[in-house]
Amino acid sequence: MIDTSTITNPQTLPVEAITQENLRNTLEQFAEQQKQQFIQHRPVTDLVLSRSTFIDKLLIRLWEHYEVNQYPDIALVAVGGYGRGELHPLSDVDILILSAQPLSDETGRIVSKFLTFLWDLRLEVGHSVRTIDDCIEIGNDDLTVATNLTEARILCGSEDVFQCLQERINAGNFWPSEDFYRAKLEEQKTRHARYHDTTYNLEPDIKSSPGGLRDIHTLSWVARRHFGATSLLEMSRFGFLTDAEYRELVECQDSLWRIRFALHIELRRYDNRLTFSHQPSVAENLGYTGEGNRGVEMMMKEFYRTLRRVLELNKMLLQLFDQAILDNGKTVETIQLSDDFQIRGHLIEATKPALFQARPETILDMFLHIAQNGDIEGIAAPTLRQLRTARQRLNVFLVDIPEAREKFMELVRQPNTLQKAFRLMHRHGVLSAYLPQWSQIVGQMQFDLFHVYTVDEHSVRLIKNLNKFNDPENRERHPICCEVYPRIIKKELLTIAAIFHDIAKGRGGDHSELGAIEARKFCIQHGLSRPETNLIAWLVQKHLLMSVTAQRRDIYDPEVVAEFAKEVRDEERLDYLICLTVADICATNQELWNSWKRTLLAELYYSTQKALRRGLENTPDVRDRIRHNQQLSSAILRGKGFAPREIEVLWKRFKADYFLRHTHKQLAWHAEALLTHDHDKPLILLSKKATRGGTEVFVYNKDKAKLFAIVVSELDKKNLSVHDAQIMNSKDGYTLDTFMVLDPSGKTIPENRHNTIRRALVNALTKMKSERKNKRAPRKLMHFNVKTQVDFLPTKTGKKTTMELIALDTPGLLARIGAVFAKQKVSLQAAKITTIGERAEDFFILVNEHGSPLTEEHQQALKEALIIKLTPQD
């Protein structure tokens, strides 16, 4: 065994200890030692530096061991992050073997042996073997190489060769600072775009996400190239970083380093992404604890807040660099806005150095100017610096200043506030400085696949979405909202509801109820009238009502519509609610919005509008609706040559419910096929045009126990998702089932796939058997624990049993549910299928084999069978 002292100083290794096995053991022991030191809360800065120092000593010893040092004009140089002296457990060890002239064959062989041994030790070595001329030539063409060279640090070998490289790098013709700055700015923009220009991603990259370590590196690179500053501390000495900003950047870097170090000690291979699979263990390593996913959510909240701080500093300092590097000596036109503000170029700036500290309410004046002036693109760096200082020194929230409250209400009434001002207010911490409740949700995430953004980012995106309803170009995507929103007179009420709709998340309890209380306090404090206050509080309290009703209830049931209409009460509330609902869905996850959801909400909106206009006490006559549907459908069929008598004979087989739940066009479509069909064989129809936002699959067959399970199993095998199932039988025992399906991207099924799907269903129903095709659950699902829940809900009539089921949304879920229904002799009447991230939240209407509601004993047996069948087995 080797001497344990070599764990800290491999430079003392004797020749006989330099073996692959011994050095692998040394590296493993050093890694374990660092892991224990990290867990024992040793400062991460010390650990990162000590790893770099350890690798320095190891490489120097091996350089000597292979006698590369006998060659005078060659040097071993650390570059990149290693050149900065920053090595995390899995960081690449980037080295440059630098020579004055191309290596001779003999030297090349020795260098090759040196490198091969490093790889044999399983070090992640990134290497290049170049002459000084090579470095300059390649560096001139490659920004990454040029950047690495600016951070070069000699380990051993020829100082003269290294100094010669440094002189060439620092010469004016090698990446002049103006060119370097522009290139780095473009590089950062491209990198940010890869992450959708947001710090909030479900599985963020600690290094590359906006606000990550790369944004700190970018500042260092630009400062080094232009000012010669080799560290953040030197940047502060040059005056481009205040002492407070320096301390904040160091604090943020330390926080990001701790998370990165905690991640690396959990991984086998290099990665900087905080994936779902590693978030719990990283949180545990960092000491975040709590019930369920609370520890993860606390860690991610701090992480996102750190990214925000870095991003704000990065943008501000780069703008200062821009002025120093690109605008040095240039005259920029200014336009006076008021005594306190002016526009310089396209940026707003304060005209007084301590304006915000002297009169904090003027912070809101600045954003009023931004909302009112389309030429303003952002805030000038000196003004942003002043804003940051004032924000940090506030001893009260801005909402407690009467003048600030007046300006805030003026701001939310501005038509352009939603588009630009609110986004900037959020980015620069002004919403947090104004509202104490908002400050609590900044960075608040939920450990699931449904909520793509943190609560604060989601709310800002919701507000931005409301503004999109003013744009006619969005009419195709949001037809109702683009019609309704422009006619809403007091749009500020909707904006305030949007601010508060999720403001109580993360507190425990019902966030809608708690948020409504907070909204009511805000309205009273800001002098809103009682009707305005009641409307805002109601919108916050009921912001999920329309979405839940449309997606989980049978909106073609007049009782459901009547119940919803009673809750809404009038058309004004309905208009406000649909705009808030659609903006909320689209701001939760961009992939959630599709033609299916649009159609569901539209049908609920128009059905409710009719009910409100008709009067809630006047319910529609069911017989009139059936008669009307049949007359319109019969006219279509007679026009195609079908005799009234044969239509009448067919329809006598069907129950009244069938004519209520289908449009006259659907009735005609079904009848046209059924009147020419052999009733001993299954009939499968697929709608050619989108129906209710999806592709309709109509299934006619002699009813059998496993039919539902077989159909959904076949649809699943074809990679189709069922969003709605309407299950009904004819009087003589045939199914008249309709399944609304979409493809994985949320679109209708292209017609060229219809025949394949039809044949598969006919074949399966003929055999009454569907071959199971086991699909692997997506990787992300493996890290979530969704407890299977089965609840039976009360119904007004008591004629059917309503069941709600929550489970992990694994492949083949509906087929397994259908198999349990068949085994328990339960008949399905209708189903609403909703997927919320990793959770399936499904709604079923059931009866027993005799058409009666399930007894309590039957409900309990069904519940137990479903939980056993759907609970993932370890």
UniProtKB/Swiss-Prot annotation:
Cofactor: Mg(2+)
A GO biological process held by the record: regulation of nitrogen utilization
Uridylyltransferase as annotated region, ranges: 1-336
Enzymatic reactions: [protein-PII]-L-tyrosine + UTP = [protein-PII]-uridylyl-L-tyrosine + diphosphate; [protein-PII]-uridylyl-L-tyrosine + H2O = [protein-PII]-L-tyrosine + UMP + H(+)
InterPro entries per UniProt: ACT-like_dom_sf (IPR045865), ACT_dom (IPR002912), HD/PDEase_dom (IPR003607), HD_domain (IPR006674), NT_sf (IPR043519), PII_UdlTrfase/GS_AdlTrfase (IPR013546), Polymerase_NTP_transf_dom (IPR002934), UTase/UR (IPR010043)
Location of the HD domain: 455-577
GO molecular function terms noted in the UniProt entry: [protein-PII] uridylyltransferase activity; phosphoric diester hydrolase activity
Pfam families membership: ACT (PF01842), GlnD_UR_UTase (PF08335), HD (PF01966), NTP_transf_2 (PF01909)
Transmembrane stretches, start-end: none
UniProt entry keywords in alphabetical sequence: Hydrolase, Magnesium, Multifunctional enzyme, Nucleotidyltransferase, Repeat, Transferase
Domain notes: Has four distinct domains: an N-terminal nucleotidyltransferase (NT) domain responsible for UTase activity, a central HD domain that encodes UR activity, and two C-terminal ACT domains that seem to have a role in glutamine sensing.
NCBIfam families documented for this protein: PRK01759.1 (NF002487), PRK05007.1 (NF003448), UTase_glnD (TIGR01693)
Family the entry assigns: Belongs to the GlnD family.
Protein name: Bifunctional uridylyltransferase/uridylyl-removing enzyme
Organism per entry: Photobacterium profundum (strain SS9)
